[in-house]
């Protein structure tokens, strides 16, 4: 089957934003205007097409990223709608990894919010070009100029309006196009069926000012435009459009649009901007990977190149089983083909190829460069794996995910539940790289860990609904960590010799703090005092011991371990003996490495009316919070603080009480920090 849409006319985009900025509503309107759906569903009514999970429809939030394909002006647009809640940022991260462009939706009243900053940072890591849609222009307190100012102040980016609103709040009824220099006035009885009109006379002055600001910003990035501007030559709309596209593709400039998705205003103009300014797969840089010898391989995005793709999401479907979502970077693939998972070195067979629309699907026989699809039948492939045609060894850069910060114990209610629970949890962990399952070696309990209380609530709900597993859960616990703060050299010696073959393993290790870099192992053995075949056992012994901790049984992180000496026995040495010796050497750091307990610190932002600022600050301080800043925001004050996670359980109820239900808050993991002595002693005592 031949390709239906050229690469130039394909767009792979994501919709990203802070929670409640209107991402899913925006996506619904896009689908409506492109003819993909014929009846609009509302998120707050639980009728959204893109929020298809039961929990999403009940809670009115997006939990997973849903994929769909729409068509506009002879272009195919693959869209991924992502969650805004901080507990589900992994969905945003893995979507951005495979997208070429994004629409960032921000609230016209709130401007840039904490999760906007997080998703913006994630998009910047992957160098994703973006257009910005200032939504909810009909909302009380909407202020387009303020929203743009927050983009510059909080994100520090070159962002300029390419549109200007006609009115705001209830009077928002049109948009001025600063590129074409005309206006579009909406017919409020049937939005988006308005007409092009001259720019209102009372807005001519600000329109010219804003167009000049746009040109000034772009001229710092575009030499040709700068010459025209300095020489006061007329700048055509075509020239301005080309300059916007060029700067947007380089992610050095971000055009700002306005509208109200709920009222159906500005969405068609945004679709035009997606086609005009966001990149096609052939506009982005060639994909770079590495072969088995760690040599760089560059692949251009052409159908004629060998097939290479990245798996970015795995999910369990009740009808077809395991679905693997992937993005093709070069070449093409047919249903039924055999491919290599070059990350794991395994062979996989592609079953059915599916074009997804939220949770419905359309089968296709062949897929090409730039396509985002799902495939049935992959056995070993997980998130971040590279898939390539047979004979290739190229591996693309994978994805890094944050470690969980909160954990609970789950206990099956019956024997039947016990049998099902292990399988269900394994499937859920396969879908979500930030969800971890492990056993507490002391109590034998099954522990599940995630990014927040909502994250784990959803997991427990899915256990019950999708897998029919009934389970009891404990109160949430903080996922503390341990580390050492002092460099030390320790000896580990394991000798058992009592007739017959014994055990002999002997190592000298140097352990040193490795802040923010995780675990690192270095082999500095000279002269074979520890034979090469036992070195992996030493590394494994240390890694296993790290998981069990040295102070209170919490995982040890950020440690560099160097094997520099030791000895062996020709007959009695074994991998097991060296593993045990290595773990003994690590345990010695309890007395020599000045170990400490680390606690997760959360970045908390509370938005409260002025009347309650004192209450909120006093309460945060009592929770060991460190105030970072506070700023006025519309008719409220935004207070930002770093607070230990252990102090934040039940905070929503207290905040409601302290502010008569008028404040909101959001928190996300910021970093691990050394716990105070009193807290450390309390933790050790509790775990003893």
From Swiss-Prot:
This is Elongation factor G. Residues 8-282 form the tr-type G domain. Catalyzes the GTP-dependent ribosomal translocation step during translation elongation. During this step, the ribosome changes from the pre-translocational (PRE) to the post-translocational (POST) state as the newly formed A-site-bound peptidyl-tRNA and P-site-bound deacylated tRNA move to the P and E sites, respectively. Catalyzes the coordinated movement of the two tRNA molecules, the mRNA and conformational changes in the ribosome. It comes from Onion yellows phytoplasma (strain OY-M). The keyword Protein biosynthesis applies. One of its GO terms (biological process) is ribosome disassembly. GO terms for cellular component: cytoplasm. The gene is fusA. The keyword GTP-binding applies. It comes from the Bacteria. Keywords: Cytoplasm, Elongation factor, GTP-binding, Nucleotide-binding, Protein biosynthesis. GO terms for molecular function: GTP binding; GTPase activity; translation elongation factor activity.
């Amino acid at each position: 089957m031949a390709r239906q849409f050229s690469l130039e006319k394909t767009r792979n985009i994501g919709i990203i934003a802070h929670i409640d900025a209107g991402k899913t509503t925006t996506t619904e309107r896009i689908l409506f205007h492109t003819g993909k759906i014929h009846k609009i569903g509302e998120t707050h009514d639980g009728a959204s097409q893109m929020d298809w999970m039961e929990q999403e429809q009940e809670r009115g939030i997006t939990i997973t990223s849903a994929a769909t394909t729409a068509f506009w002006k002879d272009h195919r647009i693959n869209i991924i709608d992502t969650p805004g809640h901080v507990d589900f940022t992994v969905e945003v991260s893995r979507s951005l990894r495979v997208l070429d462009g994004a629409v960032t939706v921000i609230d016209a009243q709130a401007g840039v919010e904490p999760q906007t900053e997080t998703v913006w940072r994630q998009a910047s890591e992957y160098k994703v070009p973006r257009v910005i849609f200032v939504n909810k222009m009909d909302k009380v307190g909407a202020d387009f100029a303020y929203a743009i100012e927050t983009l510059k102040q909080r994100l520090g980016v070159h962002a300029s309006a390419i549109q200007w609103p006609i009115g705001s709040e209830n009077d928002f009824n049109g948009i001025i196009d600063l590129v074409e220099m005309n206006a579009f006035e909406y017919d409020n009885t049937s939005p988006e069926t308005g007409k092009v009109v001259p720019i209102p006379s009372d807005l001519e002055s600000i329109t010219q000012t804003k167009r000049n600001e746009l040109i000034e910003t772009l001229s710092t990035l575009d030499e040709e435009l700068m010459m025209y501007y300095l020489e006061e030559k007329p700048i055509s709309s075509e020239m301005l459009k080309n300059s916007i596209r060029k700067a947007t593709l380089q992610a050095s400039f971000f055009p700002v649009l306005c509208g109200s998705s709920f009222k159906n205003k500005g969405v068609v103009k945004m679709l035009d901007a997606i086609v005009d300014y966001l990149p096609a797969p052939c506009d982005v840089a060639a994909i770079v990977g590495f072969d088995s010898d760690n040599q760089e391989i560059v692949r251009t995005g052409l159908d004629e190149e060998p097939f290479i793709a990245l798996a970015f999401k795995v999910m369990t479907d009740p009808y077809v089983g395991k679905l693997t979502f992937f993005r093709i970077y070069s070449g093409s693939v047919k249903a039924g083909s055999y491919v290599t998972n070059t990350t794991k070195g395994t062979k996989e067979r592609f079953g059915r190829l599916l074009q997804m629309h939220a949770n419905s699907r359309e089968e296709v026989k062949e897929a090409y460069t730039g396509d985002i699809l799902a495939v049935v039948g992959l056995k070993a492939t997980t998130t971040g794996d590279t898939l390539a045609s047979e004979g290739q060894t190229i591996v693309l850069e994978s994805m890094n995910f944050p470690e969980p910060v909160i954990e609970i114990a789950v206990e099956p209610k019956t024997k039947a539940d016990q049998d099902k629970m292990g399988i269900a949890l394994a499937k859920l962990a396969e879908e979500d790289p930030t969800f971890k399952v492990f056993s507490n070696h002391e109590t034998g309990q099954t522990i599940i860990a995630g990014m927040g209380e909502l994250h784990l609530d959803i997991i427990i709900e899915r256990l019950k609904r999708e897998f029919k597993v009934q389970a009891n859960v404990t109160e949430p616990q903080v996922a503390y960590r341990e580390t050492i703060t002092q460099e030390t050299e320790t000896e580990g010696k394991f000798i058992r010799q009592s007739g017959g073959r014994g055990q002999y393993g002997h190592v000298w290790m140097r352990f040193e703090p490795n802040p923010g870099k995780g675990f690192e192992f270095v082999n500095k053995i000279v002269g074979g005092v520890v034979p090469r075949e036992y070195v992996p056992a030493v590394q494994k012994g240390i890694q296993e011991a790290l998981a069990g901790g040295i102070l209170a049984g919490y995982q040890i992180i950020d440690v560099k371990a160097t094997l520099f000496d030791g000895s062996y026995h020709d007959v009695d040495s074994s991998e097991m003996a060296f593993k045990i010796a290595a773990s003994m050497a690590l345990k010695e750091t309890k007395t020599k490495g000045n170990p400490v307990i680390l606690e997760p610190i959360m970045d908390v932002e509370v938005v409260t009316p002025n009347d309650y600022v004192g209450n909120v600050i006093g309460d945060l301080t009592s929770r060991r919070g460190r105030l970072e800043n506070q700023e006025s925001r519309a008719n409220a004050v935004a207070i930002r603080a770093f607070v230990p996670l252990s102090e934040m359980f039940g905070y929503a109820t207290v905040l409601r009480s302290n502010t008569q239900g008028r404040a909101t808050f959001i928190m996300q993991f910021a970093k691990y920090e050394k716990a105070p002595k009193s807290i450390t002693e309390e933790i050790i005592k509790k775990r003893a």
